[in-house]
Amino acid sequence: MGAPAERTGTWAEALLTFIQRYPGVHLREIRRRLGIPIGTLDYHLYRLGKRGLVSVRMQGGYKVCFPETLIGEGPPIPEPDKVLIALLRQSVPRSILLHLYLEGTASPQLLGAAVGASGPNLSYFLKRLEALGVVEREGAPGQRQVHLNDAKRIHEILLRYPPLPETPVDRFVRFWSELHP
């Protein structure tokens, strides 16, 4: 675990700024990144929610947080985008969409190898992305191909809502796994 972020204001201010910068972030990731004790985090999320500044909801087994107003960008995030953004905070769905965006249509086997996902894990996320209308699988079993339905929308969301910055531990794990595949 990395060191908690240095505080310059209150935990509520740090929390709101973090959620505005990284909408759809998971509760445990907030705790890990900001070093806020879980009880304090729950308290401040409740208070910010009561003030209409953030919303917290369960999605895919995770508590995810969204700002009700973005920093300097006006209206709240549209509901269909919230589901996709929260999914993109997870590495496998993000890798799937980035691969399809950059490389184009791919078979599930090629996609699984490219993103480092097992068959069941890949299938789980493809079903979720397909239910959102983001990807489509076509063809007979054994000859299936996966493609993006709206590459422009994915591009806009990926640019507008950047991934969380890599921590030193994340970099070490990535480096180590590249050296020892």
Where do the model's predicted regions map?
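A short acidic, leucine-rich amphipathic alpha-helix
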Residues: E29-R32, L110-A114
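Long, low-complexity, charge-rich intrinsically disordered regions
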Residues: M1-R21, R47, M58-Q59, V64-R89, ...
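Histidine-centered active-site/metal-ligand motif
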Residues: H26, H44, F125
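Short capping segments at the starts of secondary-structure elements
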Residues: Q20-H26, E103-S107
